[in-house]
């Protein structure tokens, strides 16, 4: 599971996700990538589920790059707790993904295998995505 080793602050503001990603919009390491077309928070569990779906389909052949890391904590108050009395306890970790961001990359497998592996990963994520190929230099 992806979790930061150390953070300066345990609780962070929710923030806004306006516009599209500033960087990481192209396939840089692999041959094919999974690009977000909508914005959302992606949890460390969702990232791990997508990774497992891809690697199992590829039968541990090829290589998978995870280009996002859940560095932001989210909190929740306990069940039956009244409003007020401060912010809740940290519950888990998320990565705010804006549209245009390439989240996963795949290389070392045939195109049909790569596309199917990325399609399986699409179903594990809360954002709409599209499969893109690396541009020829």
Swiss-Prot record:
The keyword Calcium does not apply. Pfam families: Ribosomal_L16. GO terms for cellular component: cytosolic large ribosomal subunit. Gene3D superfamilies: Ribosomal protein L10e/L16. One of its GO terms (molecular function) is structural constituent of ribosome. GO terms for biological process: translation. The keyword RNA-binding applies. Part of the 50S ribosomal subunit. Binds 23S rRNA and is also seen to make contacts with the A and possibly P site tRNAs. Belongs to the universal ribosomal protein uL16 family. This is Large ribosomal subunit protein uL16. It comes from Leuconostoc mesenteroides subsp. mesenteroides (strain ATCC 8293 / DSM 20343 / BCRC 11652 / CCM 1803 / JCM 6124 / NCDO 523 / NBRC 100496 / NCIMB 8023 / NCTC 12954 / NRRL B-1118 / 37Y).
């Amino acid at each position: 599971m992806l979790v930061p080793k150390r953070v300066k602050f345990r609780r962070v503001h929710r923030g806004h996700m306006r516009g599209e990603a500033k960087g990481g919009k192209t396939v840089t390491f692999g041959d094919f990538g999974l690009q977000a077309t909508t914005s959302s928070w992606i949890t460390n569990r969702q990232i791990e589920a997508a990774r497992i779906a891809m690697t199992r389909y590829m039968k541990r052949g090829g290589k998978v790059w995870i280009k996002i890391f859940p560095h932001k904590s989210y909190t929740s108050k306990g069940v039956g707790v009244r409003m007020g009395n401060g912010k809740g306890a940290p519950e888990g970790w998320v990565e705010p993904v804006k549209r245009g961001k390439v989240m996963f990359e795949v290389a070392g497998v045939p195109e049909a295998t790569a596309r199917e592996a990325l399609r399986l990963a699409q179903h594990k994520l809360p954002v709409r995505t599209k499969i893109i190929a690396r541009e020829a230099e």
